[in-house]
Amino acid sequence: MKRRRKNKRIIIFTFILLLLALSLILYKSTLNIDTHGYQKETYQVFKELNIVDKIIDKDYSKTLEKVINSEYFDSKYIDEYLNINYKEEDNFLEQIYNLLNIGYKSNDINTIYNKLKTDNIELITSNNYIKDLTNMLNLTYFKDNNLERYIKYYLNNNYNYIDVITYVNIGLDYEFYTNTIPVVDDSDILAIVNKYHYLSSSYVPDDLVTISSKYSTRTNKLRSVAAKAFENMAEDALKDNIKVYAASSYRSYSDQKYIYNNYVKEDGVQIADTYSARAGHSEHQTGLATDIADTSYSFIKDNTKESNWLKENAHKYGFILRYESTTEKITGYMYEPWHYRYVGVDIATFIHENKITYDEYVARNK
């Protein structure tokens, strides 16, 4: 009898130990979740979904905590929720649900929220998946307020994402001479003047100087820094038996208006716009641009010793060939091997080495 009682006690004791061990295991499991910050109710959902093992080894995710108890939870996105940084913003859970359904991953979504204003995220969720979106957002010259234009231009053209951002920043998603903007500072040496940016009709540079007659076909003026640079360039060209002259430099607003209107009378607006600027949109009014002539006092032509020398050397003096043969779709002007613009040595060298237009440079640096 005593032996039976003893055996019974051993069985009971063993059973109690097993219960304690099981309780300890359950407690540790619960403890692990608690150390990650999840609520007990959330952990219960983890158990029901059989995803505890996925959660235990991961850092606490407030996004997962919030979404798992909402109507926007989808179990197939567990791994994505774990890596999405939570934002205390209206419609956050709905927006990430929509972004995930479109095809964006957690890294994409984090970038989207880091780079965009909340209102603009609706533009993303209202469109199909854009594979280059995060690449666009990470460009230093991406502009939040241009997002809708970027998306439209990207979807309607076959350009890479760098060109899309660049061209929209230039304004090329609009027709030339539409959506025009006044130049912020007319006197800025680096002011961009093109078919989207115009100078005031009253602007006249206050530092115009006359270019030495040794380097000019007639009386021509440039701003002092550009005039000095041109004279240095023309003098150094002489050392290589190359003679170049300033043929048409500063023009006033009224001068340009007169010239352009005459061209329109001859060829019509559409054709005139390909080779002549409308008043206010001419670089000549800046006092930083000049048309260059050869010894016959005619504008230099392509593939001549003068044009070849300038192409290779003008940047050393701060000048760039403004309208090249391959850039008409960007500048809106036909090839002008004679038209050079002063922008300073550093920028001119960068443009020369990278084979880009000044429009592209400004679009990526302002």
Per-region residue spans from a language model:
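Core hydrophobic alpha-helical transmembrane segments of single-pass membrane proteins
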Residues: 15-22
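Extracytoplasmic cell-surface/polysaccharide-interacting catalytic and binding patches
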Residues: 2-11, 23-248, 253-366
